[in-house]
Amino acid sequence: MEVKVFKLKEIKLLSGDVINIEQYCNVQPILPAYGKEGDACMDIYPILCEYDEEKDRFIYHTGLAFNIGDDANGEPNEMSLRPRSNLTKSDFYMPNAPGTLDWGYRGELLIIFKNRISRDLVHAVSTLVEVVDNLRKHMHLPDSMVGNSRLKLNNVRTTMTNILAKVSTPPYNCDGKDRCCQLIINSAERISWKEVESIEELGESERGNKGFGEGTGGAAKA
């Protein structure tokens, strides 16, 4: 399968500014590639990472635009984006995985990551620790009265500082070596609906209308 890809010269930032990739980025756009022979998916290499403060997410730029073309039958293809397995080692995730790049999209391929730990929550807890600590100081309580409490406050503050550092650090580097996710291109077979007059025309099945866990857990049949 041959797919058209264009290495962009410029990319648009969240601020609306348009920057020159060659001048602004440390690495130039890199074509997706298979990591090993026989791999189903190609790895994607990011060239720039932005933090979207409003939505508390990281956006990775690839500097690539695609025309993913048609399948052998002339039907449109679709590109699926999937997280890499090493993402399970962190608290980050791709919120819309598997993501879909439709046949007609000609813009830059962007990858989004969020952290399961809200940055706002970390800030709130850290602020609470500071408030309690300041209250203790203003009340002029002796250390003998608040020894254990003070130690616990310090432990909480240290924990929150470490968590905030992790939350603020993007999951992948943009050094031309880190791979942020993977892609695969499939045929998006066209669907046409055949409406029937009664539910019986759908036919019978062992599961029937059992859903949301109702259809599992039964004894296996011999």
Locations of regions flagged by a protein language model:
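DUTPase catalytic domain/fold
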Residues: 1-222
